[in-house]
From Swiss-Prot:
UniProt pathway: Amino-acid biosynthesis; S-adenosyl-L-methionine biosynthesis; S-adenosyl-L-methionine from L-methionine: step 1/1
A Pfam family per the record: S-AdoMet_synt_C
Region (Flexible loop) location: 99-109
The protein's name: S-adenosylmethionine synthase
Sequence positions that bind Mg(2+): 17
GO-annotated biological processes: one-carbon metabolic process; S-adenosylmethionine biosynthetic process
UniProt similarity note: Belongs to the AdoMet synthase family.
Residue numbers binding L-methionine: 56, 99, 240, 271
Requisite cofactors: Mg(2+); K(+)
Designated gene of the protein: metK
Assigned keywords, A-Z: ATP-binding, Cytoplasm, Magnesium, Metal-binding, Nucleotide-binding, One-carbon metabolism, Potassium, Transferase
């Protein structure tokens, strides 16, 4: 059986869609800091010289949307019109309204534990054992490349870099599922007009790619595509408009797991699109960390206004050490997947979300859904 290839991509914090995600989550964090029970659905649109912030919010908090937006754009690095976008001169339009009372009555309960889901939907969580973070390697290293691009841009190691960038990594896998190596690397980065293509290629290769990608997976056959169009001066919101929630595969598993379709950024934890996807990652990671499977994908689904999940299913791709029915029983016993329960389980009603809005929501140990604190109880209950 031949080797097979799998590719994932990532984008930098300066990508237009990620600007939008970060603004939406910055607004969410500012509201949650004052009002942990707020209901927030914040959507952002960015284009040349303009940011529009909209959505539905019900809260006792007051936040300065304009200042939050300008600070977020400024921190990303868009601080001059030469870059195509300027945090201090762009127009900001605020069209936020209130959450529908029809939704509120389905979510709020006299007993908080019976809080209903904020919407119907299906969510997936995934983990595998091919990296230390129990994440797929293609998305992991794609994130690392654009994160490194941001670091060397901000510390001026490569002063000609600009905020917008994209990466893509293709891994080759052996028939047994182990990593054979890296087949191809793509990195496109916005840059100032004065840098030559040869200097850019050398700088990206030596300062970004080589320090990030393990040498053991690189070979003379690995293909590199660095700014393959030859020019990327026009970027950010001038090059493309940006929208919240348009990078859902970048945000999750790079395509290696299925996706329920719901985006994360700008949504408070009552929205199971976000909170249940985090809980599903928590479940899948603990199952793999406990040695109960080498790969695990879990699906949960909800009905609006109903607390209990309408379904839980698990797929281990033939790698389970115990029966999948037992795995589902273990999940039901040790993880509370009701909206209130998972918010409490992962301590989600707090301002932790802006940091998630670039470089992936999963595989980063600073987030509570990455904890592996259920490993021992799962192993004991499974009898292994």
């Amino acid at each position: 059986m031949a080797k097979h290839l799998f590719t994932s991509e990532s984008v930098s914090e300066g990508h237009p869609d990620k600007i939008a995600d970060q603004i939406s989550d910055a607004v969410l964090d500012a509201i949650l800091e004052q009002d942990p029970k707020a209901r927030v659905a914040c959507e952002t649109y960015v284009k040349t010289g303009m940011v529009m912030v909209g959505g539905e919010v019900t809260t006792s908090a007051w936040v300065d949307i304009e200042e939050i937006t300008r600070k977020t754009v400024r921190d990303i690095g868009y601080t001059h019109s030469d870059m195509g976008f300027d945090a201090d001169s762009c127009a900001i339009l605020n069209v936020i309204g209130k959450q529908s009372p029809d939704i509120n009555q389905g979510v709020d309960r006299a007993d908080p534990k019976e809080q209903g889901a904020g919407d119907q939907g299906l969510m997936f969580g995934y983990a595998n054992n091919e990296t230390d973070s129990l994440m797929p390697a293609p998305i992991t290293y794609s994130h690392m490349l654009v994160k490194r691009q941001s670091e060397v841009r901000k510390d001026k190691t490569l002063p000609w870099l600009r905020p917008d960038a994209k990466s893509q990594v293709t891994f080759a896998y052996n028939p047994d599922g182990s990593i054979a190596g890296i087949d191809a690397v793509v990195l496109s980065t916005q840059h100032c007009d004065s840098v030559s293509q040869s200097d850019l290629i050398e700088g990206v290769m030596e300062t970004i790619i080589k320090p990030v990608l393990p040498a053991k997976w690189l070979s003379k056959d690995t293909k590199y595509f660095i700014n393959p169009t030859g020019r990327f001066v026009i970027g950010g919101p001038v090059g493309d408009c940006g929208l919240t929630g348009r990078k859902i595969i970048v945000d999750t598993y790079g395509g290696m797991a299925r996706h329920g379709g719901g985006a994360f950024s700008g949504k408070d934890p009552s929205k199971v699109d976000r909170s249940a996807a985090y809980a599903a990652r928590y479940v899948a990671k603990n199952i793999v960390a406990a040695g109960l499977a080498d790969r695990c994908e879990i699906q949960v689904s909800y009905a609006i206004g109903v607390a209990e999940p309408t379904s839980i299913s698990i797929e281990t791709f033939g790698t389970a050490k115990v029966g999948e029915e037992l795995l589902i029983d273990l999940v039901r016993r040790h993880f509370d997947l009701r909206p209130y329960g998972l918010t409490e389980m992962l301590n989600l009603a707090r301002p932790i979300y802006q940091a998630t809005a670039a470089y992936g929501h999963f595989g980063r140990e600073e987030f509570p859904w990455e904890a592996t604190d259920k490993v021992e109880v799962l192993r004991a209950d499974a009898g292994i």
